Amino acid sequence: MYPVDLHMHTVASTHAYSTLSDYIAQAKQKGIKLFAITDHGPDMEDAPHHWHFINMRIWPRVVDGVGILRGIEANIKNVDGEIDCSGKMFDSLDLIIAGFHEPVFAPHDKATNTQAMIATIASGNVHIISHPGNPKYEIDVKAVAEAAAKHQVALEINNSSFLHSRKGSEDNCRAVAAAVRDAGGWVALGSDSHTAFSMGEFEECLKILDAVDFPPERILNVSPRRLLNFLESRGMAPIAEFADL
């Protein structure tokens, strides 16, 4: 069990079923020390309003010994790497994930998908690319992994991709993990929980990493401090309340 989960959704994304309090309770039971709530960006049909993300600044940092990161799973909007996160939203958020979602950016050819993903990586606005192994969006995996390593952006291995969504992701995710390994980049593990009961579940992710002998020192979820060091290296100010996690 890794003590950090970086991708989950609450009832604010109406196709998910748990509250912030539900996740805190599960984190305590499962030994999760730090997690990020990453509801969908506002361009998705059932996503929260942009004020939802701005108002995350009122959240407590730590509840019952569990640290809470304020995040978003933004949508890649176009080949220029624009995402549906801007202005005051950036000021309130600790963690910005971005990925392809069909209602916002339909699948294109390999070159177009790759251009959009690399532009997003190079924008400086995101920390993690979500489910880059989605088989509906063919990409140049090597080029994406090299860009991600260059710009200190992690590529996600998403546990839900092997269980509930994005069927047929296994081969692509092995290729992503191997390319990140070779490029010297970072991998982030995400449960992509839409109910609190699955938070912290990375069993399928770990099968992928084991298959390519991925170095554990390049996995962000190994400890809260590793993840926080990564975010601070990207410009996040140290969060005093997280010092003892």
Swiss-Prot record:
* Alphabetized InterPro entries for the sequence: Phosphatase_YcdX_put, PHP_dom, PHP_phosphatase, Pol/His_phosphatase_N, Pol/histidinol_Pase-like
Q: Which cofactor does it need?
A: Zn(2+)
Identify the EC number(s).
Answer: 3.1.3.-
Task: Please provide the record's keywords in A-Z order.
Answer: Hydrolase, Metal-binding, Zinc
Co-factor remark: Binds 3 Zn(2+) ions per subunit.
Any Gene Ontology biological process: bacterial-type flagellum-dependent swarming motility
Residue positions annotated to bind Zn(2+) 2 are: 15, 40, 194
Q: Which Pfam families does the record associate with it?
A: PHP
GO cellular component annotations of the record: cytosol
Oligomeric and partner information: Homotrimer.
The name under which this protein is listed is Probable phosphatase YcdX
According to its UniProt entry, this protein's organism is Shigella dysenteriae serotype 1 (strain Sd197)
